[in-house]
Amino acid sequence: MESHLGNGVGSSRSAKNTKNTSSSVDWLSRDMLEMKIRDKTEADEERDSEPDIIDGVGAEPGHVITTTLPGRNGQSRQTVSYIAEHVVGTGSFGMVFQAKCRETGEVVAIKKVLQDKRYKNRELQIMQMLDHPNVVCLKHSFYSRTENEEVYLNLVLEFVPETVNRTARSYSRMNQLMPLIYVKLYTYQICRGLAYLHNCCGLCHRDIKPQNLLVNPHTHQLKICDFGSAKVLVKGEPNISYICSRYYRAPELIFGATEYTTAIDIWSTGCVMAELLLGQPLFPGESGVDQLVEIIKVLGTPTREEIKCMNPNYTEFKFPQIKPHPWHKVFQKRLPPEAVDLLCRFFQYSPNLRCTAVEACIHPFFDELRDPNARLPNGRPLPPLFNFKPQELSGIPPETVDRLVPEHARKQNHFMALHS
């Protein structure tokens, strides 16, 4: 929901880490210009840089928006009024502004999207079916009309004051790295949210990035937001490949694959985790081709088999052979071996070799979170991490459930207590 990170971030890391391979990398960059990799077209970029839609759509501070909600249990419709406070995010989709409910005093976020009459709004349909502790909650929705007869869809969402992006930048400004406990907390909650989206809803988010991860700064509960790019992926049906913000885009998307899977979200999660550990984006590409160059500089050249798994059309392309960069040199500090192992599971060129979201949740990197005595640095309890509903655990092998839900959490979870 925020604007993108600047492309310059992280370039010093790239230059510092690749002095000895600069000639190979230059060759790689030149050669790969011939690949005709599908990046965003000029039309796409124009759509991304449209002027913010603010005037006359009810987001001015103090503007009152009144709507009616269906009554519950046969009761009459209820009138609800929101007072706009200030804009918290803008983009090609429209805008998000903070508002307060006059009747209850509750603070909400309202996402206002220009409704194209030619298309049904997929985001609304998706959000109406979501219910999870790590997914932002849709309270209700309504349409509004301007003097020009333009129709806007308004999604009234729970308000979460911070994002992972702003939280990470606050550490960068102080020249500090984010404490490891927060890296674990945020990455785990992304994975748990994705496990729900992927397994329970068959949904791929397609734009996981720090700006789309909301965080409560007091509890450190994380919620995935912005389902404007999300889609239920159907095997055999093609999808657009130029989705997902560049730094977090899986290599198969850069290669133009159209029959990708939810594994693209797993790659993006690895990019977020690495960014939190590093203090800046791991793969700061300046174009589609340059993004692939950045990935190869760290992971090395993909094998022919790996390229085939990403997009069979490129198996004959001759890539210069570049060796992988050791992780301890990438991060220039000692990382726990569990962190390195999890990153390796996220960053597989072959989508089918990446770990699933559930497999990530049971990874030893998160064992500290399963300790019954684990606390936030200020001594407060951790946010709810193990309050699984039956739907979340459906189809998961019993031995995986045992690793997923620690014993102390089973006693607190009524469903788990009945089945343990």
Swiss-Prot record:
Species lineage: Eukaryota, Viridiplantae, Streptophyta, Embryophyta, Tracheophyta
PANTHER family linked: GLYCOGEN SYNTHASE KINASE-3 ALPHA, SHAGGY-RELATED PROTEIN KINASE DELTA-RELATED
Task of the protein: May mediate extracellular signals to regulate transcription in differentiating cells.
Biased segments, Basic and acidic residues type: 28-41
Family matches, as SMART domains: S_TKc
Location of the active site: 207
Catalytic activity: L-seryl-[protein] + ATP = O-phospho-L-seryl-[protein] + ADP + H(+); L-threonyl-[protein] + ATP = O-phospho-L-threonyl-[protein] + ADP + H(+)
Modification note: Autophosphorylated mainly on threonine and serine residues.
Alphabetical keyword list: ATP-binding, Kinase, Nucleotide-binding, Phosphoprotein, Serine/threonine-protein kinase, Transferase
A molecular function (GO) term: ATP binding
Ranges of residues in domain Protein kinase: 82-366
EC number: 2.7.11.1
Polar residues biased stretches: 10-26
Assigned protein family: Belongs to the protein kinase superfamily. CMGC Ser/Thr protein kinase family. GSK-3 subfamily.
Name of the protein: Shaggy-related protein kinase delta
Transmembrane annotation, as ranges: none
Database matches in InterPro entries: GSK-3, Kinase-like_dom_sf, Prot_kinase_dom, Protein_kinase_ATP_BS, Ser/Thr_kinase_AS, STKc_GSK3
Region annotation Disordered: where it falls in the sequence: 1-61
Protein residues bound to ATP: 88-96, 111
Sequence ranges of Acidic residues compositional bias: 42-53
Residue list for modification Phosphotyrosine: 242
